[in-house]
Amino acid sequence: MFDKTKKIYVSDVTLRDGMHAIRHQYSLEQAVRIARALDVAGVDSIEVAHGDGLQGSSFNYGFGAHTDLEWIAAVADVLKHAKVATLLLPGIGTIHDLKQAYEAGARIVRVATHCTEADISKQHIEYARHLGMDTVGFLMMSHMTTPRHLAEQAMRMESYGAQCVYVVDSGGALNMYDVADRFKAFRDVLKPETQTGMHAHHNLSLGVANSIVALEHGCDRIDASLTGMGAGAGNAPLEVFIATADRMGLNHGCDVKTLIDAAEDIVRPLQERPVRVDRETLALGYAGVYSSFLRHTEVAAQRYGLSAFDILIELGKRRMVGGQEDMIVDVALDLLQRRDARGAGAH
């Protein structure tokens, strides 16, 4: 059942996950305009970073138009209500990067690991608490392990000092029952004061539904983005989620019309590739592939004359996870070899 008096913590990810949709190319002016609208609308936090987190700007993930610190400082400078959040993936970002992000204005950090690798977050979570940051554990690709094992990983993050732990559906592969099971498992083992969060992707068109089910099972924080701006088919669209929550009489604290206008007038025109469910983004959810593989896969498909759908399905079969972007080309070359072998056999 829903507690309609409980305030939903609304966490916007347009300026972090949304980076993937435009290959990390937001200008400072665009970032500030989006942040201002979100702040006026009443969201609680605005995550700002390269799509792959602090120091994600690289050959492997793609170079950003600006540094993380430039984006963070620009956004922090204009906010009156919302707090600046950022993302850190241990192994990409370091505690030194986190300290600089804090100095630039970030006050919340989500420390993200693969769903079975919470142990690598210890140093970063402890340091974030030392800085006095609101510290969140972020268990990516949560569909790839059982609810019980995911809850055990959440307990580890909690033991390191995480004040909130997220179910992160990076592949957009979870359905409502999967989400319910994971939040039930979290509540069974986490301390009552430890908050929980839901980060949905819309690859099976379930981003909003999964977020609502998470709330039904005690979730405290919901990630969403304007127009769903994010990797793959995007995240739960913020304006749709808030409109739904509003119709249900839930306490969200946001202005629906301001979000709808910002989505349509500011964010949608920036999309060079529509953020939607289509053949390729559906393949992500269907095969359970990391959503940010989408743009890299489409480049490889074009280069080698292959179907992006076929590459994504094969990546899913091989259970590739975030950080293995280099395997996209390997898979493409294997598919090319198979195709050539079939062609040779036909003669």
From Swiss-Prot:
Provide the top EC class. Answer: lyase
Q: Which PROSITE patterns match?
A: PYR_CT (PS50991)
Active site residues per record: 20 (proton acceptor)
Q: Which family does it belong to?
A: Belongs to the 4-hydroxy-2-oxovalerate aldolase family.
Question: Catalytic activity, per the record?
Answer: (S)-4-hydroxy-2-oxopentanoate = acetaldehyde + pyruvate
Pfam families from the UniProt entry: DmpG_comm, HMGL-like
**What's its EC?**
4.1.3.39
Give GO BP annotations, semicolon-separated. Answer: catabolic process; L-leucine biosynthetic process
Task: Report the protein name in the record.
Answer: 4-hydroxy-2-oxovalerate aldolase 1
Q: Which CDD domains would you find in this protein's record?
A: DRE_TIM_HOA
Detail the disulphide connectivity of this chain as listed in its UniProt entry.
none
Positions of substrate binding: 16-17, 170, 199, 290
Q: Which GO terms describe its molecular function?
A: 2-isopropylmalate synthase activity; 4-hydroxy-2-oxovalerate aldolase activity; manganese ion binding
- Top-level taxon in the UniProt lineage: Bacteria
Positions marked as site (Transition state stabilizer): 16
Cite the entry's keywords alphabetically: Aromatic hydrocarbons catabolism, Lyase, Manganese, Metal-binding
Q: Which residues form the Pyruvate carboxyltransferase domain?
A: 8-260
Residues where Mn(2+) binds: 17, 199, 201
Matches recorded under HAMAP family? HOA
Whose protein is this, by species? Cupriavidus necator (strain ATCC 17699 / DSM 428 / KCTC 22496 / NCIMB 10442 / H16 / Stanier 337)
